[in-house]
């Protein structure tokens, strides 16, 4: 019974960042060098392998690998033989290793994120970046050249006949003299040299101009005719010198080689001798490796116009390298030539000055070089001046692979880059594409600086190896092992890495090494994110291996499967059965199950009693369960006494799907459930299973008992109506008990004299109290009832006092009531003030009774009443013997007559159609109308037939509401009616048969369409609804009640909800459960409305209960439109609109003109001038809501609506009414209520804006997770609706969830593209003046609607040709009102009318979907979701914040930041004075105008700020500088000094505020746009979110619910709120409670 202080949250925040190679090494316990896992002979982990005990810890608890040290006493010892540290085997779950890679590799998340992080930071295209990292090549088409002999080429190392490609040649050509000739590539060679004549062979050799060998085969015949055959080097000559050959003899195997290159001259030669035999290519297509410049001398960069990070072909890079060598050799010559020359001008440095005319010696030259002089001007011997280059180009480095990228990243100075980007941004238009690109890069640079991450960490040569127990090898049958995919992926990385290391040691050719580096990069990619680039790595069954990313993301990832959905101990599962004898807060728990669940508790009690030693406790444990010790049952009874258990039924759609019960031990194997808690669980007893959980800690038990117990969850949090409602048998029983025969009950009178009792027309019995009546009934039932045999027949003599017999009854107030015995019995259990002895207790009346009991007597009395009703219901349902047979189905005699009449009507319509009086569409509509009317009449006649038979079982079921409805009765005994085809169109031939008479074949076939569609819908839409619920929960999960009152004076105006001329919600329902945002004023007296019945004034802050809501909704008054009166100056009302009836003059000066509004300023001026009274006209109806029927007048023969129902009357409307002679109007007060939409709490909502907690009718408590309740309230019926489709059997009805659910999703997801044509809405308040169609166009005629607004201007609206107008000429329309059919895009409403009308539209439309299905959900739940959808703004210009254009940020946050910026800006002048004389704590960089010509100006840390320095910084538009407030100098070991101390940032240039636009977000997007990265990553796009969060070094402050569940601590909602964290709880057993009470009473 120890006190438990419960909800201390241990983790305040979680930061994510990039792991540097150094940090991985520090965390690692050793390097994994081998790919092996376990030794196949010994089964032990291999040393240095993936399961090595030395690295990851021992396999056996407190035992080293070789077994030298065993036991906990050696803990911490490192075995000198095997090197394993003696510790718990749990270490294998937390110790990590590492793999040292032979070459750096890129992390795939940073390369392939969208947009790519590496690409942005380096400003290199993603494609080029990938090509470099994966050693790719580029396909180029270019000309080729061959080198010619000559000293120039030889000096460059080029031999004659070497190939140069165009880009390479162009580089050489620009800087060097290189002799080349254009070349062609031999694509194909046809044939071989064959002798054309007989003759003698002569072979000659010569060199071509490219110094390649050319053989001439010459054949000369006897007549001196000769033929020449040129053959290129490398060809095999098949004849010899002097050989005689015949015609047709082959002379060589070929004359040219394919893929060879020839100069134009060589090609012409061969073309001459072998015409048509050679095919060549001049533009050559080839793949060539690409490289990136990693370092370059600034002067050389300028000379060749390249910079670090530029992408080149490998050939180009080599050419530049050669060029640099040649240029450097020229510089060497110039250095030698400058010796002994004289300087033309002086050169000065702080350290030394070189005078004009100084002779340049080797020593002077060296000094100048050291000072960084690159060029100098000196005099030649002839007196001319010449520029000499004296400093050679130092470096030109390039490379490929991640290694090259790492070099680039290492070179980035983030501070300098930031200064340069900011400087560049200043010169650009913020909206330009280039500006956005720079902004994105700048944001990334700032993120790196802020987080402390280094860009080079994106490339690593150390990768961590996760602990082996997180990637285990599991032995399966047959001695084989099942391995985790990660082991295979690690194995591949290690194998490839080891192979690369060997190749590097062997100094293998570059091409082999490069290939090996590429496949190592791919192996690491697959380990991190398999399948993201190229083909995924697969196992032998071609199944892609699950990489580290796959372990995180998706439904089966770490977040959703293991962190948000854990398995729970102390739980069980069993089938449920009904427990009619249970109380509402009890459940039946099978004994065996209870013993298993409470085993530790039972064991603890038994051990305490029997003093068993701890060693034998384990044996004892088995004995308890296996042998079922008798003592165990006794202890179990004690243990479970008052110990609540939680029952849960999947799917857990809303919070009442988990409730607490007090268990009762029962025999059998099924959990017994109270029948009245089935509705919230949506459970039935056809094989459903439920899970049971045991709350262990005292606090968990306290929560279960006081918050989750089923008796406290009777009222629905979705709508405030009872959830645990009696149903089926219980209603039938209660109805049977309280029913009567209507005619008899009506006709029998209550006697006024004793003599009248029992006489004709009077009741037979009268009772003085309910107990007397019950006794009499029970006694007569026994005494009077008898069964005896008479004339061979069984005769049952009935009681003289049946249950439904009308009797008289004297009530406590002395009045005599007419009732029945059944009603008296029923009312015994009802609270006295709610007893009604005249009503039949059907479903509706029972619901009302339960609700009234809850309102007046509280939840406990309601729970007791429910139990009583349950007992009565089952008892009397059993006694009633309710059954149905085919004979109980009664068919109306008028049925056939009505059907035949309708058939005649249809024939008449058909003949009119055939005669051409009707179109096909009109004929169809008329026929449908006839059959709809016929079905309604048949239904009415059938109901009339049944009403005559009160005790007909079918009618009893329907009338009581126990089961079935009039529509099903219509199908059984009337006619099935019209059906819909699969597309939803109504089939015009109805089913005239009913189920009693049976359907014909055609009718049966017709009826199958709907049923089939219903079944298909059920299957398809259940998942859709589930996913919708998930998204809703995700978007709203972090909304909890965080404070009592946010203090806002804003609110929304209460109104009835209408959509398309159909009322969706009454005003009273809209008001119920809300808090007033303003006082509600009486339209007549202008005073706060007072309700005498409730003794309540409706002032700001009052919470509206149901009766209050009904009172205010019905509070209407008829008041004059305007009235004239004289008012004293001091009595002038502030809230009214007043106009002066005359000019008010003082000394000739007009203070107030006639007809002008009287303002407060005018009143003050009049008062100062001594005016006492004013004659005014008061427009009394202004700001009140019109609540009469639409007010229409005739103008020029046309009907025009002046005032619409629910329109808020303004001044212009009042004047129009006055103009048309309307004196009075019926209005209701303007009621403004607090709403989640207008709440100004920074996090979550405040209690006042949320209002009443609908499950207990009190103001909501702080900590309530209202977001999740809202999401569940909306999502749960979504699933229900999809499942209910099939109950109608596919009958043609106007609404069906098929339209409902996709429409709800369409609205919540705020689709940009909607199905069907787009509808139009009015953007202003006005009157429709014209509706017309445009001239015909290709697709049809566009609809045009012209509206005159309240200022008299005409506005034209054009709508899609497929739409129809829903308004008529003369109608009044309000802003946001629909004008045409078709779907209105919510985004357009936001754009044109703003956030308020958008929220109103979404609320009406979403509410309509649910209302059509008869689902009641309170508006506040929808408002919470809508709040999340409209809570964000899109940044247009981030100003001087870190926000990027396109970023989505909460509206409140942006407002707050802008306010802070404006406040900071006001201190700039002061700040500028304060910083002068202080020292910089952080260096300030002023970027050079031209990076290549000038150096950046850098004021280092410790620089003292002078006026001059400050002005330079201000001119550069640097916003902030950081200076030391206090500091001291510290000297390092190297002798350098630097400052340390406290620093402060000062704003010295005004910051720009954020410019933004309000945005409507779909719920999926709104879920992702959260400040906390943990919650967002667990929802969708895990990789993207984690990547960005790591770069930014984001901190999650764990404000939401999901984040806290993930880190395993109480959620900041409910009892997890800090408010309740320090409460102490203790569990007091019932007998101790009694003792405590006794002591108290004695005391």
UniProtKB/Swiss-Prot annotation:
Enzyme class, UniProt record, top EC level: transferase
List the InterPro entries hit by this protein, alphabetically.
DNA-dir_RpoC_beta_prime (IPR045867), DNA-dir_RpoC_beta_prime_bact (IPR012754), RNA_pol_asu (IPR000722), RNA_pol_N (IPR006592), RNA_pol_Rpb1_1 (IPR007080), RNA_pol_Rpb1_3 (IPR007066), RNA_pol_Rpb1_3_sf (IPR042102), RNA_pol_Rpb1_4 (IPR007083)
Q: Which domain of life is it from?
A: Bacteria
* Gene3D superfamilies documented for this protein: 1.10.132.30, 1.10.150.390, 1.10.1790.20, 1.10.40.90, 2.40.40.20, 2.40.50.100, RNA polymerase II, clamp domain, RNA polymerase Rpb1, domain 3
Which protein are we looking at?
Answer: DNA-directed RNA polymerase subunit beta'
Gene responsible for this protein:
rpoC
Q: Which organism is it from?
A: Petrotoga mobilis (strain DSM 10674 / SJ95)
State any GO CC term.
DNA-directed RNA polymerase complex
Reactions catalysed: RNA(n) + a ribonucleoside 5'-triphosphate = RNA(n+1) + diphosphate
